[in-house]
Regions:
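The feature marks the mature, well-folded catalytic cores of soluble enzymes
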Residues: 4-253
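Glycan-association/targeting regions that enable binding to alpha-glucans and other polysaccharides
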Residues: 247-305
Length: 305
């Protein structure tokens, strides 16, 4: 299934990409370009936990507040005009979002996309960018993080866990508030058990790789240079997530499982998981380990309840 809304810039060919992808994979196509479901938005400013919670900056409000947007090939283009309640209804109808968390935009992020400073690692864990105290968008990021933690819980009803990752400066030490590019390690993409992470310079990249590996044990963390002088992707205010958002699957397997915390080795405990597939699920097994270097346990067959 593909969902297409309208991009918030005059890029008509970009707007048609979802339709070509849907045709190539023979997938259903849902388009939010006609009233009352017309919605303007950007993939970099939307994340979902897959369980009904979505995140965006308040850019989504500006993009759908009415008024002149730009002059297109067929004449003037206007922003859709929606209230917050109407936007929430569209997000629920097309994206399955029941809780829509909106955060303030950042003053030094020119595109106001949340993927430039945060990443959902799982349903309970937020990877959040970090600046030195008082630098660039650091104060607003901290305020946004406290807003989320104070007002929302994860889909499992637990407080969000937070992993911090430093945002690197330029070679000369500049951050976005002093004309440095918006370098970020949160603009990453999951591809099965691999995570593609934007890289810049070794002295900072090694720290980012360690943080990802500790937060996502068992995943293969692959860095991609986006700050190369020959092909400087980050200079265009984006990195890997900005140009991909996600890599879908034609027949996805959904496994939702809350992590088990503080499990004493001599105690028994219950493992719960929601497992879904288009063809159904006949059996499921649990493999566990306390040390990836020693491998996994023999399989334990789960009971369908």
């Amino acid at each position: 299934m593909c969902i297409r809304d309208r991009y918030n810039r005059n890029r008509p060919y970009d707007d048609l990409v979802p339709e070509h992808i849907a045709a190539y994979f023979n997938a259903d196509m849902y388009i939010t370009t006609q009233s009352p479901y017309n919605l303007m938005g950007t993939g970099g400013n939307f994340m979902s936990d897959g369980m009904g919670t979505g995140f965006s900056s308040k850019l989504i409000l500006d993009e759908n507040s009415g008024g002149y947007a730009w002059n297109g090939p067929s004449g003037n283009v206007f922003y859709p005009n929606h209230t917050l309640s109407e936007i929430e209804d569209i997000m629920q109808d097309f994206m399955g979002i029941q809780t829509y968390i909106l955060m303030e935009t950042l003053p030094y992020d020119g595109i106001h996309h949340i993927d430039m400073h945060m990443k959902l690692l799982d349903e309970e864990t937020i990877l959040m960018a970090e600046y030195p105290p008082g630098v660039a968008d650091g104060p607003q990021i901290e305020a946004n993080l406290q807003y989320v933690l104070s007002n929302y819980n994860s889909a499992f009803g637990t407080a969000y866990k937070v992993v911090r990752i430093p945002s690197p400066p330029s070679v000369s030490g500049n951050y976005p508030n002093t004309n440095g590019y918006y370098r970020t390690y949160t603009n990453s993409v999951f591809v099965n058990n691999t995570v593609l992470v934007p890289f810049y310079r070794q002295e900072y990249d090694t720290i980012a790789q360690r943080i990802y590996e500790e937060a996502l044990p068992g995943y293969n963390i692959v860095g991609i240079d986006v700050d190369n002088s020959g092909v400087n992707l980050i200079a265009y205010s984006g990195a890997i997530h900005c140009i991909t958002h996600s890599v879908g699957a034609n027949e996805p397997l959904l496994i939702q499982h809350q992590s088990l915390e503080d499990t004493p080795p001599l105690s028994s405990y219950t493992v719960l998981a929601n497992i879904q597939h288009t063809s159904g699920v006949n059996t499921a097994q649990v493999y566990y380990t306390t040390d990836l270097a020693t491998g996994f346990s023999p399989p334990i067959t789960m009971t369908n309840t």
